[in-house]
Structure formats: C-alpha cells, structure tokens
C-alpha cells in the first residue's frame, strides 16, 4: 500500500539519523531487535487493520518534523507523578488549571524541589502529568479536585487519597524515601498505609493534549485503538473497570514536550523497570511495539531511531 511505502522511506531516513554511538547508548538500557524490518514482522487484521490504514491516512496529512535526530530530545524523569482526571484534553497548562487541585500542588512542589534532588537518584526531572486514567466520580472531594489517587512512576505505586492540603508534607517525606536505594518497596509499604502497588505490567501514555497541539488530538485516538486491539490478542488489555493484575493500561496524558515529533508515546515497563519514550510513532509500528516490547518477558526494542530518551531504573 502507498502509506507503507511512505513509511518505509521515512523510516529509512530516520534510521540513518541514529549513530552507532546512539545505538550503543540505547542498548545499555534495553536490547535492540536484531531485525531491521520489524514493521513487517507483525500486523493486524480486521478492525485493527482498518484502524492502521485510516490512521496512516490521517497521519500523512500532518506536518511532522522528520529531520532532527530524536535521541536525547527529551529528559528522563526521576519521578513521574500521574494524576487521574478522566479527561482527554486540558487547558494549556494542564496541571495549573485549578490552584486548589492535587495536580497543582504536586506541580508546584516539583518546581520548588527539583534542584534539591538534582544529585539524588537516577533520571533528570521531577514531573507531574494529568491523564485520562479514571478518577473516583463518587467522591465529592475528588470531583472538587482537592483529593485524588496519584500514580508514581517508575516505582509502580499508587499514593491513595492524597489531599491537596497534604501534598507538600507527604512528598517531603515520601520522595526522599523513593530516591533512597537502601529503602525497599516492602519497607515503604509497611510504613505508609496509603501507598499501594500498581499491579500492571506496563503503562503506555499517549499525548492527547489538543489544546496545546491539534496534531495530538488527531494522532492519539488512532494509536490507542491499535494498542488496544493488539493487547486484546494477548489478553493484556485492561479497560478502566478491569483491575486484573499483569495487564497493560493505555491512557492519554497532557503535553509531554516536543509536539513537532508527534506522536509521543511513553512506555513504562515494570520488568525490567524501564522507561522508553518514543517520538514520531505511527499506527503502522504499534503492532511491533506491542509484540517486541510489551508482550515478551525479555523485551527488545524495535525502531531504536524513534527513541527520544530511555532509562533503565533500579529494580525494587
């Protein structure tokens, strides 16, 4: 098909941007697929195939920057706080919409304390994001924004029932413990009853922040549908009401930076504890991402030229 030929041409151009040094840097965190033709190794049928075809046609109409090498065009977080909102789009500064909200307080705390933790732990930034993950609509305080559960990555834990008035005191105590390599997960859970393990094997976040860039509002739904279809084939798909362990949650997030490299996809794997942040992701390559990176017990990375940043964190 025409879009596959266009994809192969663009992929060839992008692949040439990744130097041998860049491949070596990536391989320090994850094994790279041996095959140079990963896109043709896995495909979809039925509705999934239709979503890919329609998605590629929509993507082809968008202006995406393909000339700049992607590696190290973004920064890996030390800690990534993800706040559920049940939304797929937000105001321009998503975490700052409401000064009374949990995400506002977390964002302010991150800005205030980034320098303090600059030489502690691995990664470079303290990040707060809002997501389409579901919030508890039966809790009036959650609906007011003054209370929420917060997913903390790459630690795969939930901080439950966090109130906005308690954010500063809570994070002042919790973050140093998270960044302390001598404190185990078991000890943390024992001493903090409001902290629980996230039982997913992976989280996949797709930027859908249309208010910041309309391209993300176009690309995100297509990608999610293909991810969902492929994960269903392996029994790994989990919707918002499915809490079975060892599944994969696909969610939308707010602006992650680098919209010119749309579509941006952040993949957190629990085992090994690794973040892979990809740019210029299109529907055609999603099946290979699922089959190589998410499904296997020993993941391998297809399309290393798509990596914006990557980090293998300490397992705990």
Curated annotation (Swiss-Prot):
Domain of life where this protein originates: Eukaryota
Entries under CDD domains matching the protein: TRX_Fd_Sucrase (cd03062)
Segments traversing the membrane: none
Disulfide bonds: none
Annotated compartments: Cytoplasm; Nucleus
GO cellular component, one term: nucleus
Entry keywords, A to Z: Cytoplasm, Nucleus
InterPro entries: Aim32/Apd1-like (IPR009737), Thioredoxin-like_sf (IPR036249)
Triggers of expression: Expression is controlled by the transcription factor YRR1.
Classification via Pfam families: Suc_Fer-like
Keyword Nucleus: yes
Role this protein plays: Required for normal localization of actin patches. Involved in tolerance to sodium ions and hydrogen peroxide.
Entry protein name: Actin patches distal protein 1
Organism: Saccharomyces cerevisiae (strain ATCC 204508 / S288c) (Baker's yeast)
């Amino acid at each position: 098909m025409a879009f596959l030929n266009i994809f192969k041409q663009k992929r060839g151009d992008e692949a040439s941007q990744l130097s041998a040094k860049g491949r070596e840097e990536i391989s320090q965190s994850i094994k790279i697929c041996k095959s140079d033709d990963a896109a043709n190794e896995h495909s979809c049928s039925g509705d999934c195939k239709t979503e890919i075809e329609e998605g590629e046609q929509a993507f082809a109409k968008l202006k995406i920057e393909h000339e700049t090498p992607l590696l190290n065009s973004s920064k890996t977080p030390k800690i990534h706080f993800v706040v559920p909102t049940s939304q797929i789009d937000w105001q321009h500064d998503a975490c700052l919409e409401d000064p009374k909200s949990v995400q506002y307080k977390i964002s302010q705390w991150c800005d205030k304390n980034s320098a303090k933790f600059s030489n502690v732990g691995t990664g470079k930034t303290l990040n707060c994001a809002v997501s389409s993950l579901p919030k508890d609509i039966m809790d009036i305080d959650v609906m007011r924004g003054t209370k929420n559960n917060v997913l903390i990555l790459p630690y795969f834990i939930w901080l439950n029932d966090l109130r906005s008035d308690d954010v500063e005191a809570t994070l002042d105590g919790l973050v140093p413990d998270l960044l302390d390599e001598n404190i185990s997960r078991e000890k943390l859970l024992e001493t903090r009853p409001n902290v629980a393990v996230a039982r997913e094997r992976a989280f996949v976040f797709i930027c859908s922040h249309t208010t910041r860039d309309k391209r993300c509002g176009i690309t995100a739904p297509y990608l999610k549908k293909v991810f969902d279809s492929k994960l269903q084939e392996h029994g790994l798909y989990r919707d918002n009401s499915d809490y079975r362990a060892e599944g994969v949650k696909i969610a939308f997030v707010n602006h992650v930076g680098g919209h010119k490299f749309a579509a941006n996809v952040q993949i957190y794997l629990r085992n090994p504890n690794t973040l892979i942040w990809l740019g210029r992701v299109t529907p055609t390559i999603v099946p290979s991402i699922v089959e190589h990176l998410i499904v296997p017990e020993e993941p391998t990375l297809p399309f290393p030229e798509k990596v914006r940043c990557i980090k293998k964190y300490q397992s705990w």
